[in-house]
């Protein structure tokens, strides 16, 4: 497995945003970025054997910094909406950031999609990790999260999320990739 990483842009506060390419021996590859622990490219063979990117996304990493659709992002602390931006655990009510009407969506403005994650190479992929302190976005508990992306010689990608916290809290992580199985530049209505 060949893994390449390079800095492509910086956040407004100067943190480097990197692109990681994980390529197998057939030339198929996956790309990720530490901005939101995102999966940004899935270049795999089509039925004729030609490589095609089947993920919908942006042309540059700078575009992901402005993304409002969570393209390829690791979403958390809580994927989906929490009604009225609040919940109760053990008779204590927690008030969250409001970012979707009266609700909290995908962890609010402080969600995992809007963070620069730490990273390390794995033999067959990339591990991203993030620390979210107690009270961030209104959520209780210090939490350490990991997202592993592993790619194999059969062109299979495994995505695994792990979380560890020091108190009762809500956690519901997911990956928010969008697919066009026809490949870039083709109409999604041509899926077969």
Describe the role of every protein-language-model region:
Residues 1-192:
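An exposed, glycine/acidic-rich loop-and-rim segment of catalytic or binding clefts
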């Amino acid at each position: 497995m060949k893994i390449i990483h390079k800095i492509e842009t910086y956040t407004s506060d100067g943190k480097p945003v990197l692109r990681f390419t994980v390529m197998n021996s057939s030339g198929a590859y996956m790309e990720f970025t530490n901005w939101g622990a995102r999966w940004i490219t899935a270049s795999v063979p089509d039925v004729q054997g030609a490589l095609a990117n089947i993920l919908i996304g942006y042309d540059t990493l700078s575009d992901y910094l402005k993304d409002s659709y969570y393209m390829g992002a690791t979403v958390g602390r809580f994927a989906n909406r929490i009604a009225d931006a609040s919940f109760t655990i053990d008779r204590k009510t927690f008030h969250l950031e409001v970012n979707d009407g009266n609700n909290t969506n995908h962890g609010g403005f402080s969600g995992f999609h809007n963070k620069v994650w730490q990273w390390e190479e794995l033999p067959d992929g990339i591990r991203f990790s993030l620390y979210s302190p107690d009270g961030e976005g209104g959520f209780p508990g210090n939490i350490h999260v990991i997202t592993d992306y592993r790619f194999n010689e059969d062109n299979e990608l495994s995505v695994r999320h792990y979380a560890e916290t020091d108190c009762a809290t809500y956690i519901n992580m997911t990956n928010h990739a969008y697919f066009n199985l026809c490949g870039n530049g083709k109409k999604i209505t041509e899926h077969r």
